[in-house]
């Protein structure tokens, strides 16, 4: 059993909604400093224009810099400033999609908190009830924000192999899945029961 859970990921991301955050390509929820800005600008000059650097400089000392996949990795790395960094989890959005063995198209999104939402070049975390938390830059905000899944452009959902999705969450089988044809009413783990997709 993994020490990291889908429930824990959602709790961490919900906490991040209350922090002062700003989007920084390649960031891992680290305190914004001039050295951090300079380092990331050298790594990814395409994403650090002069105007963007000036914006980031106004956040020095008061904000945490992160990107979408960095927010997931910061949970695995022990939280703010990543005190428990491990290279085996240091991957990009496509890497997370590729390593997942359990995934599907967004139309089949199960009602399971902690699933990763994916579109090319971007990820978020499903928190239930048709909502997502993501770290983004653009019309949806700058930093960690909560958004609606519908109409956002997500193409797939997936489970990360490093997270335990068996958080003891159970549901009573009563939908129109095949097992209900036998009048099954036993509590079942949400990962083993068909659930209706989010509209």
State the predicted function of each range.
Residues 34-58, 83, 87-106, 147, ...:
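Surface-exposed intrinsically disordered loops and tails
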Residues 112-115:
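Loop/turn positions that initiate beta-strands
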Residues 152-199:
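Low-complexity, Gly/Ser/Thr/Pro-rich intrinsically disordered linker/tail segments
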């Amino acid at each position: 059993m993994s020490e990291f859970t889908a429930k824990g990921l959602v709790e961490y991301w919900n906490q991040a909604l209350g922090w002062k955050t700003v989007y920084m390509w390649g960031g891992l929820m680290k305190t914004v400093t001039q050295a951090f800005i300079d380092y990331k600008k050298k790594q990814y000059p395409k994403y650090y224009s002069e105007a963007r650097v000036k914006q980031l400089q106004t956040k020095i000392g008061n904000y945490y810099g992160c990107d979408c996949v960095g927010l997931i990795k910061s949970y695995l790395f022990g939280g703010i400033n990543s005190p428990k960094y491990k290279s085996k989890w240091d991957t990009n959005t496509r890497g997370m999609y590729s390593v997942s063995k359990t995934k599907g198209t967004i139309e089949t999104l199960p009602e399971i908190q902690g699933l990763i939402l994916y579109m090319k070049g971007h990820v978020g975390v499903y928190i239930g009830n048709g909502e997502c938390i993501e770290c983004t830059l653009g019309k949806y905000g700058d930093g960690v924000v909560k958004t609606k899944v519908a109409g956002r452009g997500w193409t797939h959902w997936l489970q990360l192999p490093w997270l335990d999705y068996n958080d003891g969450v159970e549901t009573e089988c009563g939908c129109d899945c095949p097992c209900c044809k036998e009048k099954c009413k036993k509590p079942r783990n949400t990962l083993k029961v068909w659930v209706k997709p989010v509209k």
